[in-house]
């Protein structure tokens, strides 16, 4: 059984969107690009709007939410309003402001559960980090950038079955202790990966000379890309699918 060309193209577009939406900020950035390419114009909330009938517009707030709309050709009383809504964010594990912690010879990331997340699927995955950073440039201006390490930099390993005999049962997961990803092994005689080193890696990879990292809003994501599954490739398997 083969899908129609229209369905195939739609699935490819959806998969590309899901793959690129590694954080809410990346999702909004993609939506803005889609709307702009479709002829929508950006409206700024600090400016007066001059809306035209039939005009296509969008508004972005905090770079984490976006509203696009088409102004009707006729009066609102005649046409009414049609609204479609979706999330730009998804349940995830978000890095704490000072995320580096240590345990049993490892540097780990301190994370908080964001939203109604299923925790078991996060174990034994190749995890990367993405989101938004805020920085100050050489002239003192504040800016922001979207970042994505684009490679697995941490993992939340499961305990071996002989250390947790109830692993296949109703073994509870403590979000404060059981889902801290391992980031690096601390070798005796060498300085462990600490907060300063982690921030310097972000600065070296994503900031220009003279730019100073001030803050971040980052989350983990599984680097495995979305895919079509099933004997006839009739299903889409992807994280974030039910939100975006």
Residue ranges with predicted function:
Residues 1-244:
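N-terminal hydrophobic/helix-forming segments and targeting peptides
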